[in-house]
A protein has these predicted regions:
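Membrane-proximal helix-loop-helix units in multi-pass membrane proteins
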Residues: 71-136
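Alpha-helical transmembrane segments of multi-pass membrane proteins
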Residues: 15-31
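Interfacial helix-start motif at the membrane-water boundary
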Residues: 41-61
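Membrane-water interface of transmembrane alpha-helices
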Residues: 57-74, 139-143
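Alpha-helical transmembrane segments and their helix-start/interface "positive-inside/aromatic belt" motifs
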Residues: 1-16, 46, 87-94, 125, ...
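Membrane-interface interhelical loops and short amphipathic "cap" helices
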Residues: 2, 29-45, 111-124, 150-152
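Terminal transmembrane helical module of multi-pass membrane proteins
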Residues: 134-162
Length: 162
C-alpha cells in the first residue's frame, strides 16, 4: 500500500478526533478529576496547563507545515538524520504519527485503570504508554532535524513544533 500525504492527513484527523474524545470520555468518567494529576499539587497546574497548550500549538505547527505547507515530494524525502532518503518518508511520517497518537489516545484510560485496580503491573502499563508517546515525539524531532539538514523550507517551524 502506498502511503500518501492525503492518507496521512485523513489518519491524523480521524485519530486526532479519537484522542480528543478519549480525553472527554476519560475526564467525564472520572469520579475525581483532580486525582488524574497523580498527586501533583493543584497549585502547580497553573504552570503545567499553559505548557499543555504550548505543546498542542507545537503539534499543530508541525502538522500544518508538513501536511499542508510543504510540497508533497518533501514528505517522500523525509529521512532519519543518520540515513539517506529512499523515497519512504511518508512511511516514516505515518509511523511517527502512529507511535505518538495511538498512545495519546490510551494513556488517560490506562491511568484510570491503574487508579481503580490494585494490580502490580498497571504502573508499567501507564509508563509504557507514555514512553511510546514520548518516543513518537522524539521521532517528530528527528524527522524535522533531517528536513532542516536538507534545507527544507518550513523545517525550522517543524523543529520548533516538535
Amino acid at each position: 500500500m502506498e502511503i500518501t500525504r492525503q492518507f496521512i492527513r485523513t489518519f491524523v484527523i480521524i485519530v486526532g478526533i479519537l484522542v480528543l474524545l478519549s480525553y472527554v470520555y476519560g475526564v467525564s468518567k472520572s469520579d475525581d478529576a483532580t486525582a488524574l494529576w497523580g498527586g501533583i499539587p493543584l497549585s502547580w497546574t497553573k504552570f503545567i496547563v499553559p505548557w499543555m497548550f504550548i505543546a498542542a500549538i507545537g503539534f499543530l505547527m508541525y502538522w500544518w507545515t508538513i501536511l499542508y505547507s510543504v510540497d508533497a515530494s518533501v514528505i517522500d524525502n523525509l529521512r532519519w538524520p543518520w540515513g539517506e532518503s529512499d523515497g519512504k518518508g511518508a512511511n516514516r511520517l505515518l509511523l511517527t504519527y502512529c507511535v505518538f497518537m495511538i498512545p495519546s489516545m490510551l494513556w488517560l484510560e490506562s491511568t484510570q485503570f491503574h487508579m481503580n485496580n490494585e494490580y502490580s503491573w498497571t504502573p508499567f502499563l501507564v509508563i509504557g504508554i507514555l514512553t511510546l508517546a514520548s518516543i513518537g515525539n522524539i521521532m517528530f524531532g528527528l524527522l524535522a532535524y533531517s528536513a532542516y539538514q536538507d534545507g527544507v523550507e518550513g523545517a525550522g517551524t517543524m523543529l520548533l513544533g516538535s
